[in-house]
């Protein structure tokens, strides 16, 4: 595996490989890689002749400078994981490489980007779309892989691809969890042992809510989750929404949509964790 730091060098490598007829898969990441990322990389390796994994902590998607400063940076360990997964290239550019000038582009995909994360993290999805579009332009992948844990992000990127007419396939990949159910996240590294134990209440509550939902209304299920998280030690609920999986708009009845997802964000101590669960899926 090669580690590449400039767009020019990456494009030179990819041009030669495309001339051999190879398809290119892209896995955008911010590093601090774990088994969830590995599942995306392995999927790409299985479906493409060449896999590029970007490792870049994108400053424009952080609306909290403290969160940006604390985000784990572990490039050497990341490269070892990527090599083990069969990636061809780790693309680890500098901020100056990706943003030689400030990016003033405004991306708006309302109502997808105005609810949930969009409401609580203003500017976040604009930053996500800035960097993802830059990566798409630099790599020109045939397929790009994103995890379903960032459910809203995946929906917004699909819409960006549709509106900007990118000629690529977006592949959503299932959430990867620890054996005890905790959704894998780079931020889990910041949890103390006690906080990690408390964080288990998030996934456990979501799993219970899926069973609960089979015999209760949407509003009853919403209340059950909110009360369970509020009663759990060391957790502070930011939001829990039960939404249409395509439009991300709230549903009031299970009959409102064939695709219904519960999306949650919880603070465990100072660490902000997200998760989701599918109640109905086509």
Curated annotation (Swiss-Prot):
Pfam families: Pantoate_ligase. InterPro entries: Pantoate_ligase, Pantoate_ligase_C, Rossmann-like_a/b/a_fold. GO terms for molecular function: ATP binding; pantoate-beta-alanine ligase activity. Pathway: Cofactor biosynthesis; (R)-pantothenate biosynthesis; (R)-pantothenate from (R)-pantoate and beta-alanine: step 1/1. Beta-alanine binds at residue 61. The reaction proceeds by a bi uni uni bi ping pong mechanism. This is Pantothenate synthetase. It comes from Bacteroides thetaiotaomicron (strain ATCC 29148 / DSM 2079 / JCM 5827 / CCUG 10774 / NCTC 10582 / VPI-5482 / E50). The gene is panC.
């Amino acid at each position: 595996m090669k580690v590449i730091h400039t767009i020019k060098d990456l494009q030179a490598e990819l041009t030669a490989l495309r001339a051999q007829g190879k398809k290119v898969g892209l896995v955008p990441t911010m590093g601090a890689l774990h088994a969830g990322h590995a599942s995306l990389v392995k999927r790409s390796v299985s479906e493409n002749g060449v896999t590029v994994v970007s490792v870049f902590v994108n400053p424009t998607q952080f609306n909290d400078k403290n969160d940006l400063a604390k985000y784990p940076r572990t490039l050497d360990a990341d490269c070892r994981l990527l090599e083990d997964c069969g990636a061809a290239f780790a693309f680890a550019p500098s901020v100056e490489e990706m943003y030689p000038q400030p990016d003033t582009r405004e991306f708006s995909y309302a109502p997808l980007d105005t609810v949930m994360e969009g409401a609580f993290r203003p500017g976040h999805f604009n930053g996500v779309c800035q960097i993802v579009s830059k990566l798409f332009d630099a790599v020109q992948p045939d397929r790009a892989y994103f995890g379903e844990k960032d459910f809203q992000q995946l929906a917004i990127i699909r819409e960006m691809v549709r509106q900007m007419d990118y000629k690529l396939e977006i592949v959503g990949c299932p959430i990867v969890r620890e054996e005890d159910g905790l959704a894998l996240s780079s931020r889990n590294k910041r949890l103390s042992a006690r906080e990690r134990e408390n964080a288990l209440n998030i996934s456990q509550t979501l799993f219970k809510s899926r069973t609960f939902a089979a015999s209760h209304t949407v509003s009853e299920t919403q209340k059950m989750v909110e009360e369970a998280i509020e009663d759990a030690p060391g957790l502070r609920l930011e939001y829990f929404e039960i939404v249409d999986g395509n439009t991300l708009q709230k549903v009031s009845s299970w009959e409102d949509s064939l695709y219904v997802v519960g999306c949650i964000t919880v603070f465990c101590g100072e660490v902000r964790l997200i998760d989701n669960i599918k109640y109905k899926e086509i």
